[in-house]
Amino acid sequence: MALKMLTMRQFASRSKIDINCSIDNLAKTHNQVRYVKMLKKDNVKVVLVSGVAGTGKTLIGCSYAISGLINKQIEKVIITRPTISMNEEYGFLPGKIDEKLHNWLIPIYDSFSSVIPSTKVKEFIQQGKIEIAPLGFIRGRTFHNSCIFVDEAQNIDCIQMKTLLTRIGYKSKMIIVGDPEQCDLKQQSNGMVDFINRLSVYPDDNYSIQHIELTEEDIMRSDVVKKVLDIYNYKSNKLE
């Protein structure tokens, strides 16, 4: 794994990242390859990825976003995740918005830093090329020529999901990732599951919006993660 990350850093140290090489190197399974394929298609505007922990949802999506920024294929990367309710405010917290949300966004920063040095990530944030956009602040905005990355989407409610999906502007792509099994919301309030269900029964052509499901077979972390999930999924009469 360390060797793979070093190779990606070497790509990033050049004037232009070979996006096909750097992203393709991360895709090891059939589902991950399809994930990358949908990211690269210009006519696919929304890529919705559901899957268990450790399947590369965040890493692959963030790698695609940051590579597009460095290669000047987009002007901005917008990152968001449901930290608190859309109706709540951040004013009671000290510091700027990016400082307030730093702890919640560490997994995304880590994924960015696997492609480029962390100093470059900070530079992009300072330049406004990586923008942190809390869900409570996106209503009324439209993101043009951007890659919008949404993490932990299983904790977005139905109203927030609709608001989020209607922010996509000209020459933009939205990547939405989450694990429905780790949802902190009531099932009927789960915006991610709700939209996946709506998409599955929508009668017209919906090629511009794609859903990718990653399973335990796609886990990129150590084998013990898969074993832990197997234990939790195992049903035994002794536990009933």
Give each language-model segment a name.
Residues L3-M38, D42-V150, Q154-E240:
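Conserved helicase motor core of SF1/SF2 NTP-dependent helicases
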